[in-house]
């Protein structure tokens, strides 16, 4: 009888420990689903993706993750794709709710100083004017750029407090567009001049912070975009949650 009681106690202990340490597969799946969902934008958005056309060739390797981000946007979103070139904004895809078509409009940047703009902010302002009026979607512009403005000199004031940057900020505020930016070096000054990098990143910080967006960069060199897109989605979701 004593042996039977001892055996029963051992079995009961094993069941208790086993039950406490195993999470049902359904619960694990739900937990994993919540984690994945937190890296995707949860509410429809009007998104303009602007890429500076003289960025280093490595930016071309980020087209896949950029396209995946676009295709993963929620139903009801619209996307525009454009390239910032010397003196012009090349709109590859006007705003469309066909996310696959928008993703397909991405192309590898020219990656040459022949395409270098004096600054990206004239074309940013032009793109802001193309956002659809009205509607319930939030308006966001993703600027992939080195941020550098040399149109009126090469010093901190001319680059970070430039006329065109200030005009872009005013236009964004008037039209309710938040600017988010990913830093990447260009084939020009920001590929070798640390002061140019500092000016460009500071300008991206300004245009993003003053329009309710956020700038993403790490150090002074090129960083792949995977982590940036995860943080961008998280930021959009957090800001969207506060807005509703």
State each model region's role.
Residues 34, 45-48, 64-67, 100-180, ...:
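Exposed acidic/Ser/Thr-rich ligand/metal-binding surfaces
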Residues 70, 79-108, 130-132, 191-204:
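Short beta-strand-loop
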Residues 1-11:
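Bacterial N-terminal signal peptides that target proteins for export
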Residues 198, 218-244:
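C-terminal "exit" segments of structured domains
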Residues 53-57, 85-90, 99, 109-116, ...:
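Solvent-exposed loop/turn segments at secondary-structure junctions
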Residues 19, 24-29:
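Boundary at the C-terminal end of the N-terminal hydrophobic targeting segment
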Residues 9-20:
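Bacterial N-terminal signal peptides
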Residues 40-95, 123-124, 139-144, 182:
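Von Willebrand factor
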């Amino acid at each position: 009888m004593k042996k039977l009681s001892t055996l029963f106690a051992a079995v009961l202990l094993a069941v208790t420990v086993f039950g406490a340490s195993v999470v049902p597969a359904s619960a694990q799946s739900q937990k994993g689903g919540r984690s994945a969902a937190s890296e995707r934008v949860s509410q429809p958005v009007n998104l303009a993706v602007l890429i500076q056309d003289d960025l280093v060739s490595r930016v071309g390797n980020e087209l896949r993750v950029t396209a995946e981000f676009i295709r993963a946007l929620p139903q009801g979103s619209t996307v525009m794709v454009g390239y910032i070139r010397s003196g012009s904004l090349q709109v590859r895809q006007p705003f469309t709710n066909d996310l696959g078509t928008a993703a397909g409009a991405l192309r590898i940047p020219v990656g040459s100083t022949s395409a270098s703009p004096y600054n990206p902010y004239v074309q940013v302002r032009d793109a802001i004017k193309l956002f659809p009026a009205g509607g319930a979607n939030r308006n966001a512009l993703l600027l992939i750029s080195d941020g550098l403005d040399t149109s009126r000199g090469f010093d901190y004031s001319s680059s970070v407090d430039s006329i065109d940057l200030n005009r872009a900020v005013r236009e964004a505020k008037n039209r309710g567009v938040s600017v988010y930016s990913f830093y990447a070096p260009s084939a020009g000054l920001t590929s070798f001049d640390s002061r140019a990098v500092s000016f460009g990143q500071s300008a991206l910080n300004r245009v993003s912070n003053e329009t309710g967006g956020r700038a993403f960069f790490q150090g002074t060199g090129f960083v792949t975009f995977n982590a940036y897109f995860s943080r961008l989605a998280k930021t959009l979701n957090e800001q969207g949650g506060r807005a509703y």
